Amino acid sequence: MNRIIYEDNHLIAVCKKSGEIVQGDKTGDKPLSEEIKSYLKTKYKKPGNVFLGTIHRLDRPTSGIVLFAKTSKSLSRMNELFKNKKVQKTYFAVTEDMPNKEKGVIISLLKKNQKQNKSYITKLD
């Protein structure tokens, strides 16, 4: 798997593509977590189930790095770090054109499509 950017005995960091889901949902689409479990099972020739804990998620339309725990102990420790705000997350936006301002706030509404389990930005009335 060429999307892995970091792996040790405790953690694995993977590049998530836009459109993928991190964990299973009602759509039935194959989640990234299952792909990583399969990779670990094959790489380490593990019999039975493979533990993989989701430390955080990214929304379906978002691409970026997702961190998974390979052990329950590392999952617990990472959850504690996130809970206590010891981890800093940074988001970057890719835009078609250069924004007019360096900083700003976007105010819009989200409309949920229950069937697709997706949300879309809608115009304010």
Predicted regions: what they are:
Residues M1-D125:
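RNA pseudouridine synthases
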